[in-house]
Amino acid sequence: MRLFLNLDAMKHLFAYKLTTLVLVILAIASVAARAQETSNGANAESAEEITNFDDIFAEETSTNESAPAEQSAAKSGSSGVTVLDEMGIEGEGINEAAPVDKKTKAESVKVMDATELQGSSTTIADATNRSSGVKIRQSGGMGSESKINIRGMEGKNVKVLVDGVPVDNGNGNFSVNDIPIDKIDRIEIYKSYVPERFATDGMGGVINIVTHDLPKSSITGSYSFGSFNTHKASLDAKYVWVTDSAKSRAIATGISAYYNYSDNDYEFTTPYMDTVVSRDHDRYYSYNVLPYVSFEKYFFDKATLGVVYNAMDKEIQSNSHRIEEANANAQSYGVNLSLEKANLFVKGLSAALSFSYAFCKEAVIDTSHTYYYGWDKENVREANTAFGEISMGGASHIERENQTIVAPWNFDYAFTQNPILTWSGLYRYESQDPKDKRAAKGQTLNSAGFPGHSHSVVTGLSLENNFWNERIQNVAGVKGYYYSIKADDDGEKRIQQLTDDYAENKDFGYSENLRVKLIDNLSVVEQFAVKGGYQHSLRFPTREEIFGDGMYVQCSPNLKPEKSDNFTAGAELDMRQIPLLLKLHLEFNWFYMLMEDRIYWNNYASVPRPYYNSVGTKTAGFEIDAAVDVNEYISLSYNLTRQEAESREADLAYGIAKGLTVPNIPTLYMNFGAEFHVGDLIYRDDFFKLYWLANYTDEYYYSWKVSKRQDRTIPSSFTQDLGVEYSILANMLSWNFEVRNFMDVRVYDKYGESKPGRAFATKIKFTL
């Protein structure tokens, strides 16, 4: 089935891009006109006259005058204590952003309510993986590398945020499962679109994890135990002193902490072996402690100061051969200050400012004298000196000290008549000082990479408009990018030397999203709406991509950012009280993405090579979502994603022909769900839930698809989960038991690596 349209020409039409940019500028310029309109409307309002065309269709409502400003302040995205480091993060959402209601937003966004999952044993990756257009693939169990794929784009092109602030380490790998689901209010999934208010680069989309705050003095915690000796615990405690009830002033102090542990000793297989083995030497643990204090209504609506300590330790295991000694560890310290104020100086202007600093020290130690060629212990090579296990002859003891400064800001101006103008930005500084301890002793060449630092600033301006009682919604925006990267030649001996030590670039992007509600509350049709969007976006190259690692990757100072033009269109229908069904939601979305200057590195080359801007790709596909409330007790859900990504041009130097299917990207997958729930079953305010979840992923290729007869494919799979949950005392005490992959189906992930089979987990959660 072919999904591609001949839109290459469209992308290259200067008139099309120019028209889009003009529309964005005109939309933002309309702010002044709307402000004048607001002033005139205020005078006419006293005479009870209709002076605005929107008023003809507006419903009469009674609202607090300060509501727009307060909502705008709550919506600003970078609040909360968030520590960023190279190996792990945790966020305490001191102020949560206003919920994004997908039905009243023109943006391409899916919002998942995590509060319904807080009593379950599920993880953030599991929950996100159930959304259409999203695939999260892991190379193992807890603590393993995660690759997030949104509509065919993955890794560095997909950004992970916590409370609106980027937290991944820039290489596309991030262990989202370290964050307990109990700390999450909701998960916002932006597909083929990176909102200007987030002030970050990226092209494939954004996963914004919004944390929640305890509403009052309370303690909440959870503990879960599962297969492979997996333990998870979390604790949140908060105490509030009301210092001036008349002015609503208060001081709150609290602590947030979590702990994760797993042996990851599951059975697995890979294309490199013809037998099933029990995985060992793959233990992982991490913990995080975050105390904070906040001041409410002391000029700022909220001022929060927090500090954090985070640690991780992981045994390293390979999928191709046995490893028995190599390991990695990291420790980080951080501090964060955030300030929030509604109606700052003028009514309707809200601000959220934040500053965070983190210091992280990490190490990868591989100094074994033994190398195993396979998983048995018979085919082995031993040496008198350190030989290394990760790669034969590549012994190393690398330590890195990283420093990160992040300063996001967000200003919203909410006009009386409804437009919201948002100016957001994020400054980020990163430095890295890598050391190779074996090279320092003269035992080998330095393989730790080059020290250096980087500065980046991303700023966005967006205008949100709602017309005719939200029958028409529009969000338009522009975004500016700047980054500079510096590498230092420390004089250490390396295989590869720097050919340049500085890189700088700047660019801009823009977007336009429109939603039109064609039917609103007509008989059994609650609403029917259509929408469309376009964004021109880019991704910065990383420091390693530009300067190399001194070993296997050469310097490439002229590397350009990746760019993409993303087109989306969709329709959604909500119905109620139809025969045999209580509610029905149907949604269809189409997407088409044209990517150019794709950054590529040939990891199969026998000699060191640089990253370079290779052929672009084009991705097309569609999604179908359906949700049904059969009655007040039974609900069903289903979604399907179909997508194809192909090379747009030939790159004969690396054997890539035009029209080849991009490898290692699923092309067809579906999710199914069924739930039975009932309240007041045994006691008043109790709740019982029984659920079934399933996923089907079709076969796809893990190398460039040259022929349908090639056998380098990842087999199709169908997995099923079962769970039961029971809570009492209005959810103050809950218990959950879940069986994942209860049919014990062998499931393969990226590059043919098998995932853990059947697994059990049980969890207890309490609130005091």
Language-model region placement:
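Conserved C-terminal beta-signal and adjacent last beta-strands/turns
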Residues: 22, 283-289, 294-296, 310, ...
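N-terminal periplasmic "start-of-domain" segments of outer-membrane beta-barrel proteins
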Residues: 41, 53, 65, 69, ...
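Face-selective signature of the C-terminal outer-membrane beta-barrel domain
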Residues: 293-311, 330-527, 533-535, 579-590, ...
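Short acidic/polar hinge/loop motifs at secondary-structure boundaries
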Residues: 165-192
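Membrane-embedded beta-barrel scaffold of Gram-negative outer-membrane proteins
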Residues: 530-535, 562-620, 641
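Short strand-turn segments of transmembrane beta-barrel domains in outer membranes
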Residues: 188, 196, 206, 212-241, ...
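Gram-negative outer-membrane beta-barrel transporters
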Residues: 468-473, 481-483, 585, 589-594, ...
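Periplasmic-side early beta-strands and strand-to-turn transitions of outer-membrane beta-barrels
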Residues: 216, 224, 240-326
